[in-house]
A protein has these predicted regions:
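N-terminal beta-propeller domains
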Residues: 1-100, 212-257, 313-345
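Small/polar beta-strand repeat architecture
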Residues: 2-25, 95-200, 209-210, 232-252, ...
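Post-transcriptional modification and biogenesis factors for structured RNAs
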Residues: 260
């Protein structure tokens, strides 16, 4: 009896449950597998072995969790963001994004090795990559932490803080370049990394976390990035006041500093009145709103008028507190929907 090799040309069914063994009456059976390991299934049906991986760099802190988030401007401009405790590092083209060259003019044979680079601008703890050194080539292509910083020199240590002993290295000849690993300072701690949500449009990524103000990560050049708090200038606001509490602003026009006095704490933060965490919060009053800049008491705040308040009388009950603040919390989710930026949570 002839033996027939069955051709399998479609794997879009993926891995099938053991309960489907022998269920050739199901449409998915002919496009499924019992096990698909180290394979990638393409939308057209074919399956291919997954690509390999390579070691690019050690993360900033290997002892704690790190989160990787893609930053995709286009098919040719894609970055990987490494979020760790209070910082972001950026990767592109199989390597870390580095700051500009600092020219090396000398390296000692000592313990620790001391590098001379005029006006390098480094701080203790910075991570640098050294390349193009003639003579003491043992340092080329390696990463070090900076220590013992002076204006024109710095010592080399490894990631654990152990001094780099260069006494047995080849004598420094000439040249060499030092580049600091590019980093962005953030407010996000290790414990908060996996609660971050994000949405990207072109070169801007919006980042939310319930404990922090909405942030905007912007890229203007390969090594020019900024992380700034988003300034909301027109809301959103909570429900309007329905109590008899009134607000009496001293000034009402755009740009003016105003002292606002409440007749009571009722209707303000659940009856607690104004609190320290309200600094930076918007308050809608009549036709406009102001932003709180300081707290005098539970019934008195100082702020800057953003939009004319439009009050004819001295006081009004028509006010609403901003929805986003350190008091009420910040949005935990963000996305784009029909070309609009949407927050939730």
């Amino acid at each position: 009896m002839a033996r027939v090799a069955v051709q399998l040309t479609n794997f879009t069914g993926g891995e099938l449950s053991p309960r489907l063994d022998g269920r050739n009456d199901l449409t998915k059976y002919s496009s499924g597998c019992k096990t698909l390991e180290n394979l990638i299934v393409y939308p057209h049906g074919a399956a291919a072995r997954r690509p390999g991986t390579s070691f690019v760099a050690e993360v900033a802190d290997s002892d704690n969790k790190t989160r990787l988030i893609p930053f995709e401007f286009s098919t040719t401009q894609t970055y990987m963001l490494e979020f760790s405790n209070l910082k972001i590092r950026v990767y592109k083209d199989n390597g870390s994004v580095l700051e500009g060259d600092k020219v090396i003019s000398g390296i000692t044979k000592a313990n620790p090795a001391v590098v001379t680079a005029t006006s390098h601008g480094y701080s203790n703890g910075d991570e640098v990559v050294i390349t193009e050194v003639v003579g003491m080539t043992e340092l080329n292509g390696k990463r070090f932490l900076v220590a013992g910083v002076t204006t024109n020199t710095f010592q080399l240590t490894d990631k654990d803080g152990t001094n780099i002993n260069s006494t047995s290295f080849t004598t420094y000849g000439s040249a060499g370049v030092s580049n600091k690993v590019f980093e962005i300072t953030t407010p996000y701690t290790t414990a908060q990394l996996f609660d971050i949500k994000f949405a990207q449009s072109a070169d801007v990524m919006y980042i939310t976390h319930p404990s922090h103000e909405v942030a905007k990560l912007s890229r203007t050049a390969h090594t020019t990035w900024s992380l700034d708090e988003v300034e909301f200038t027109n809301g959103p606001f909570l429900d309007h006041n329905i109590t008899t509490t009134t607000l009496n602003p001293s000034h009402k026009s755009v740009g003016q500093t105003t002292t606002v006095t409440a007749s009571a704490t009722t209707g303000i933060n659940g009856g607690s009145g104004f609190v320290a965490t309200d600094v930076g919060r918007l308050v809608h009053v009549k036709d406009g709103h102001f932003q709180i800049t300081s707290i005098t008491s539970t019934t008195i705040v100082v702020g800057t008028v953003i939009i004319d308040l439009g009050i004819n009388s001295a006081t009004t009950t028509d006010f609403a507190l901003g929805a986003f603040s350190d008091t009420s919390g910040h949005p935990s989710c963000v996305t784009f929907f029909e070309q609009r930026l949407v927050f939730a949570g």
